[in-house]
């Protein structure tokens, strides 16, 4: 719709100060990069970079200058005489990016541009994309199923599910204050822990453990807490405590993920509220939970942990519709 390949059913799309609802795609000044590189295999890198400019009858000297600048910016100067078949995946991706950027468009559309790359190259290209965006300052819409890419690259992110906008905002705000349980489960790896709880007279509880005081409507709620919001505590700790049975420990070098269970009614593990009953089947008296701990803290599977909760990081959701519950 932004590119003009599909018509919108209502509202307006503006690029800068110009409404482009009825502007043909070729006149919208938009450049696109897709999951597949779509390079011309018979052309050199240099000719691929300058193809769009030549099609627009840009003066030859301007084409040469802009191709030189872009190849320098993307580290392609030594590859200008090569053809796409002689390049690595990361190099081809940079050529595809450069071919779009060299036009100096008003809007840059990226549709999963890193999904064909291996894990190491994706991390490298992610930092290059961030650096490139900071340098050129072009408005960029980046489509991805990878929430890490969304959080690290975006200044604002929009979370969609089945074509419906769930939440839009700065990455940290979406992470800290998800609008519903779908966002809570999608943004963050591991996802937010969701425990079935109860609100009564301003007090929130999970099973027999009383948590924060929040002035919210009475009834069933889902208590959300990120893995880093949980921490082992000693006997002297006077706040709410869960007894966690450690089941799986994942040492990741700079951190340790601990997966376990607590005695409570149910857990959602980042899924939508209506799935609670299904997930509780066969485990009705226990709830799954994940902690993120520093590397020096590595409990053994089968052990038990006393776990406290950072109360200011607790988020509440309506158990019926999954929407975030705001204090009255």
Can you say where each PLM-predicted feature lies in the sequence?
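Helix-to-loop junction immediately C-terminal to a conserved catalytic motif
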Residues: 3
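ABC ATPase nucleotide-binding domains
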Residues: 7, 23-182
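ATP-binding/catalytic-site motifs of ATP-hydrolyzing domains
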Residues: 12-14, 18-19, 164
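Short flexible coil/turn linkers enriched for glycine and charged/polar residues
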Residues: 81, 188-193, 217, 252-254
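C-terminal boundary and immediately downstream tail of ABC-type ATPase nucleotide-binding domains
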Residues: 177-199, 224
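Non-catalytic connector elements of ABC transporters
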Residues: 202-328
């Amino acid at each position: 719709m932004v590119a003009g390949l599909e018509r919108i059913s209502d509202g307006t799309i503006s690029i800068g100060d110009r409404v482009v609802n009825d502007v043909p795609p070729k006149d919208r000044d938009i450049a696109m990069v897709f999951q597949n590189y779509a390079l011309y295999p018979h052309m050199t890198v240099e000719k691929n970079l300058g193809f769009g400019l030549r099609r627009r009858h840009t003066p030859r000297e301007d084409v040469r200058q802009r191709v030189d600048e872009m190849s320098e910016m993307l580290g392609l100067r030594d590859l200008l005489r090569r053809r796409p078949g002689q390049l690595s995946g990361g190099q081809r991706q940079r050529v595809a990016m450069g071919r779009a950027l060299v036009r100096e468009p008003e809007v840059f559309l990226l549709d999963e541009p890193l999904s064909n790359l291996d894990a190491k190259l994706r991390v490298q290209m992610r930092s290059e994309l961030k650096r490139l965006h900071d340098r050129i300052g072009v408005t960029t819409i980046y489509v991805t199923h990878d929430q890490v890419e969304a959080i690290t690259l975006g200044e604002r992110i929009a979370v969609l599910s089945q074509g419906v906008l769930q939440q839009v905002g700065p990455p940290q705000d979406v992470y800290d204050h998800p609008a519903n349980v779908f966002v809570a489960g999608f943004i963050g790896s591991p996802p937010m822990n969701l425990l079935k709880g109860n609100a009564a007279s301003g007090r929130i509880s999970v099973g027999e453990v009383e948590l924060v005081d929040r002035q919210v409507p009475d009834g069933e709620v889902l208590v959300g807490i990120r893995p880093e919001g949980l921490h082992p505590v000693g006997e002297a700790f006077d706040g709410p405590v869960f007894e966690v049975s450690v089941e799986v420990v994942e040492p990741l070098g700079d951190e340790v993920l601990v997966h376990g269970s607590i005695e409570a009614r149910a857990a959602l593990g980042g899924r939508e509220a209506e799935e609670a009953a299904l997930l509780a089947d066969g485990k009705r008296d226990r709830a799954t939970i994940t902690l993120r701990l520093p590397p020096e803290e590595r409990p053994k599977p089968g052990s038990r942990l006393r776990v406290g909760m950072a109360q200011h990081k607790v988020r509440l959701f309506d158990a019926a519709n999954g929407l975030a519950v705001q204090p009255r």
